[in-house]
Amino acid sequence: MSQDQDALTTEVLQRLRRKEGTWQDWGAGCRQLQKQGLSPQAIFEATGIEPIHQNQLITALQVSQSLGEAPESVRAYFQTRGSDLLYELRVLSAGDRLAAATLIVEKQLDVTAVHEVCRALKAVSYRKDNSEGFGESVGDRIGRYYWQLARQQRDLAQRSRLIAQGLRFVESASGRQALEKLLTDFTVVPAVNQPRLPLYRLDTAEEVPYLVPVAGTAPLTATVLQQVPRLSCTEVFRVVAVPQGMSLVALPAWQVLLNAVDPVAILWPAADLPAELPPSPEGLPIAQVLLVVDRGLAEWDRDRYLLIAPSPSEAVQLAWLPEPPTATVVGQLLLVLRPPQVLDESLNRELWFFEE
């Protein structure tokens, strides 16, 4: 970072620490600092603005900037306040944001009401009908949402509260009549139960797949092996950016792989292994295995099998060497994987139920 950038960063930090300007200035400052590489935690330590508040300010600023055609009265209203209100609008489309922002100003909504408005607009966003007398204005869409909830409510107090909420926002006369009708029509329409989320969780490290690039099938030269790009992943779900055309193999996240520096896989003839494999439990012959070699450990180790290259143009060899070799060490062998022996693949796709 240059001296000019250092000075600018210091100036922005000082303004934020002193809370100079409006919330929009604070959001712009936080965004600028994060783009310069400062972490939210570092900004918090220097300014006292907590990371969660930084995110709210930056997001609210983005929402404010998306209200391009908003009336001047709306833009002026949010100039010095309402970052928490605009933050709630982040889940809406650009058109709905503008309508909701205008509604906030007209009805002086607080953050709880804005949260409910956003939920209502999203809930009815996929229903484009006016069969019950509700139009497509933002007020009628919110009114329809509360009308739907009120019809499903057996408790009269809750039903009345929902009707009142709908009447607060509805704009059309027909929509208002539909809501007022519920004051005398106590028919309850059963709610359609929302399905449960298909939630899964990886309970052990080995359940998380570990992707290893595959260099190809032996024989391979050291040049080909070194040309395989190295993978990197992001936490928490180990998302991997894969170059186009790369082959991968998914393995359990065994500790030997997690500790590897730069692993790469090679399909290797079982007959060319430097030691004989023990027989498989099924007694089936093994023609090919998968080797995982760590290119980051390109040094001799008496206790490891090594992948060596007599020359860059010759095929690499797997060997155990009790003495340091004259050939180049390409990597150390991490594991030899035998092919899985699954008697019936269709069984893995069936649901199994067990009685306790």
UniProtKB/Swiss-Prot annotation:
Pfam families: Raf1_HTH (PF18579), Raf1_N (PF18578), RuBisCo_chap_C (PF18087). It is found in: Cytoplasm. The keyword Chaperone applies. GO terms for cellular component: cytoplasm. Its main location: cytoplasm. Residues 209-342 are annotated as: C-terminal beta-sheet. It comes from the Bacteria. Has 3 domains, the N-terminal alpha-helical domain, an extended flexible linker and the C-terminal beta-sheet domain. The 2 C-terminal beta-sheet domains are swapped and pack against each other to form the dimer interface. HAMAP family: Raf1. Belongs to the RAF family. This is RuBisCO accumulation factor 1. The lineage of its organism: Bacteria, Bacillati, Cyanobacteriota, Cyanophyceae, Acaryochloridales.
